[in-house]
């Protein structure tokens, strides 16, 4: 298999990474894969400096709508802190080439070997170091002469919107008529630091209930736990000792009619008849009469049953004097007494037949004596 030839394509000058025959004298594991050198790509150029301080008047103070919200960009730390610590330069001196530096820093190098990376790193750091030295000298000269920063120098600044076009939504919500004030400057999760004041005013307490006390409480919420800009909300909370016997203060006055006792329901329905067409006085009267008739029949049945048991108890010889006999005992004793009555009735019927036969015999004897 022949070696990979990289002299064609886009004219890149790259070395061979795969070879036909592996040299046994050289350690194969000393070579590093392209993915292992990815962190060295960040050492090519320093991270772009922070935005200049807004000390001028006019439109240069707010290049983008986000600056009007009091947005302060977080401090960007470079990967090579030692390099930045040794060279402190003025951002105003390199604004002429700021766009190209940002674009070059965002685009990673396509070289894959450590040898080429070191060459590019040394080649790029040399002009940057010279530029930093020149900017330091110019800054010292301005400080000695006391020349203030003019608008022409600030005009050389590159707007972040020109390099990174990121739309920032800007929306304000007007305050409502209920007395609550709400200010929302952006709908994104990572929006700027906002402070929303919510004030609840209750001027008319409900009838028969003590006025509730509302205390404003500040709550700090951070959408990003590692973000430097938490959100503060002023919320009016309702603090009241719970009384479970009293109705809830948030319920409507119409709900009080639903917890009335059942005995007062006919009067409420009859009084609210003109407002609701479904309930009428005739319907309520018919329901009341039906319920009264049912109750009357039930009471009459119970009274009749009680009187019957009392009468039955009086007929039984052994239970006539006891007033606390149960119904089961009364029924049992009544059954036994009834059986006794039936047996005595049969015995008396037999005696009656015998007496009647004897009577017939005596009548025939009397008639025979008369004929003789």
Curated annotation (Swiss-Prot):
Location of the bHLH domain: 289-341
Compositional bias of kind Basic and acidic residues: 290-306
UniProt xrefs under InterPro entries: bHLH_dom, HLH_DNA-bd_sf, Myc_transcription_factors, Tscrpt_reg_Myc, Tscrpt_reg_Myc_N
Subcellular location: Nucleus
Tissue: Uterus.
Residue numbers spanned by region Leucine-zipper: 341-369
CDD domains: bHLHzip_L-Myc
SMART domains: HLH (SM00353)
Biased composition (Acidic residues): 187-197
Gene Ontology process terms (BP): regulation of transcription by RNA polymerase II
Region Disordered, residue ranges: 172-226, 243-306
Annotated keywords: DNA-binding, Nucleus
Family matches, as PANTHER family: MYC PROTO-ONCOGENE
Assembly behavior: Efficient DNA binding requires dimerization with another bHLH protein. Binds DNA as a heterodimer with max.
Name assigned to this protein: Protein L-Myc-1a
Naturally occurring in which organism (per UniProt): Danio rerio (Zebrafish)
């Amino acid at each position: 298999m022949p070696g990979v030839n990289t002299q064609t394509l886009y004219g890149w000058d790259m070395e061979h990474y795969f070879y036909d025959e592996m040299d046994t004298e050289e350690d194969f594991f000393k070579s590093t894969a392209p993915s292992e050198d990815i962190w060295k790509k960040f050492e090519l150029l320093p991270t772009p400096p922070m935005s200049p301080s807004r000390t001028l008047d006019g439109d240069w103070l707010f290049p983008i709508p986000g600056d009007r919200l009091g947005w302060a960009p977080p401090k960007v730390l470079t990967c090579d802190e030692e390099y930045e610590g040794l060279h402190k330069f003025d951002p105003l001196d390199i604004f002429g080439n700021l766009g190209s530096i940002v674009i070059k820093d965002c685009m990673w190098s396509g070289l894959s070997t450590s040898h080429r990376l070191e060459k590019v790193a040394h080649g790029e750091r040399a002009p940057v170091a010279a530029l930093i030295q020149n900017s330091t000298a110019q800054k010292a000269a301005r400080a000695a002469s006391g020349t203030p920063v003019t608008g022409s120098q600030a005009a050389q600044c590159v707007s972040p919107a020109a390099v990174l076009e990121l739309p920032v939504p800007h929306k304000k919500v007007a305050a409502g008529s209920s007395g609550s004030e709400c200010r929302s400057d952006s709908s994104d999760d990572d929006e700027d630091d906002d402070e929303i004041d919510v004030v609840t005013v209750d001027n008319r307490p409900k009838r028969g209930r003590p006025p509730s006390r509302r205390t404003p409480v500040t709550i700090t919420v951070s959408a990003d736990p590692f973000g430097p800009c938490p959100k503060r909300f002023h919320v009016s909370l309702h603090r009241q000792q719970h009384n479970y016997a009293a109705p809830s203060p948030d319920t409507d006055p119409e709900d009080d009619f639903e917890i009335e006792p059942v005995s007062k329901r006919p009067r409420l329905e009859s009084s609210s008849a003109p407002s609701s067409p479904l309930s009428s006085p005739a319907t309520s009267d018919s329901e009341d009469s039906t319920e009264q008739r049912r109750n009357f029949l039930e009471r009459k049945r119970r009274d009749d049953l009680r009187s019957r048991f009392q009468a039955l108890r009086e007929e039984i010889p052994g239970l006539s004097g006891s007033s606390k006999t149960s119904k089961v005992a009364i029924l049992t004793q009544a059954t036994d007494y009834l059986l006794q009555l039936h047996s005595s009735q049969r015995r008396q019927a037999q005696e009656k037949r015998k007496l009647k036969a004897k009577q017939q015999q005596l009548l025939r004897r009397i008639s025979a004596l008369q004929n003789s």
